[in-house]
Amino acid sequence: MAKKTESTGCDTCHWSGFVITDSASYARAELCSCIEECPHCEGSGNILSENENGYSYVAPCHSCGVIRRNVKLYNIAGIPAKYSHVLQVDAGLELKRMNSSLQRALKYAKDEFVKKYPTKDGFLLMGPSGLGKTHLAVGTISELTLKHGVKCLFKDFF
């Protein structure tokens, strides 16, 4: 059964409209069945609209179009499968176990970069292994793609 407009989702997807799985190499977002059955666009993600001058145009479905676009953006970001559980910047990170530099990076990523995007140009995380840099990067990418519709690409240089 499909939900409408702002209340898109169900208990299966925790009202997000998508579920995350891990394929062989990459995390993968898939539309929840509550979205696939959208009554507004019949699953296409688009509706026919008309502007104030009477011209018809194709627009994203107000009920599921944004979710469909954001799922595609998440899937092309190339997030490693082992991070499929990380859907927000601070997911699973414990402040008390982090050094002060990583705490500042987390605060910057969450409070400055994600919330104020695109006014910030980006950031680079450097340091020894095991600090949580990849976790922080994946969380940032997940939030930007799934919640804000921003095109991102995960790149591991090593």
Question: Over which residues does each language-model region extend?
Answer:
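A short hydrophobic beta-strand->loop->alpha-helix junction that borders the nucleotide-binding pocket
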Residues: 154-158
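Walker A/P-loop nucleotide-binding motif
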Residues: 119-137
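Short, surface-exposed linear patches
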Residues: 84-86, 113, 147-148
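Post-Walker A helix-loop "phosphate-sensing" segment adjacent to the P-loop in P-loop NTPases
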Residues: 142-153
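A short, basic N-terminal segment
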Residues: 1-103
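Pre-Walker A (pre-P-loop) alpha-helix and adjacent loop at the N terminus of AAA/AAA+ ATPase modules
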Residues: 92-123
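Generic structural signal for beta-strand residues in well-ordered domains
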Residues: 54, 116-118, 145
